[in-house]
Amino acid sequence: MADADYVLIGAGAGLSAAAGLDYAGEDFRQEFREWISRYGITDLYTSSFHPFKTEEERWAYWAKHIWFARYRPEATMLYRQLRDWVGEKDHFVITTNVDGQFEKAGFSADRIFATQGDYAYFQPASGHPKQLYHNEEWVNQVLPLIKDCRIPTELIPHTPAGGPVAMNLRCDDTFVEDDHWHRQASRYQQFVEKACDKRLLLLEFGVGFNTPAIIRFPFERMAAQFPQTTLVRFNRDYPQVVTEGIRHFLSFTEDLPEVINN
């Protein structure tokens, strides 16, 4: 870190898990006990695909989900430590996480490329127009009105034109990549281009093989192609690299808070 000219952070689900955001543990079971009893859901991820029979049930669940994962948690200690660790270094973040933790911890929104969306936004269900709608006000409005795992019909969210909405989470080809998404994609590429022949430090946190083409494989290619680049991989389960020609590589399988603190 001390020697690096640029720092590029790549973060997957393992980082938020290491930070203590547990989407299947006791906290989840307490907050979602009505849904667990009624629908048999077991965790926040798989319950996202539950086939609710009515829109009132579906959006009651999503209001609770969004609040639990996006608005209730403050910036975790681990994310704040990462921000302090980077300090004043020229840096950028690419992440598949959708929980907003980087921005909460003090990273500039202009330096974050959240490729897979953000819990904080709705989009048109059809994918058109390419616009997003912030949902915090809606969540705060409907949460107190959930009864029997339903919301009032009149509070089902819609676009300003009255059309159906979906979460802005990448799950199929209707995912909306709006103007901000494309600006951040360009900023990410520009950062890589200016750092490629300098001392670039790649910090990869908790990235597995769910979507390796977004962070894991590109980071390995950069480490192999850019001679002054060092890849540091923090991954308990998959610390190895598969790309040949990487000159500078370190991996850590220990608990991430322990590594950062030391």
What is each of the regions a protein language model found here?
Residues 1-262:
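Conserved catalytic alpha/beta core of Sir2/sirtuin-type deacylases, generalized to analogous enzyme cores
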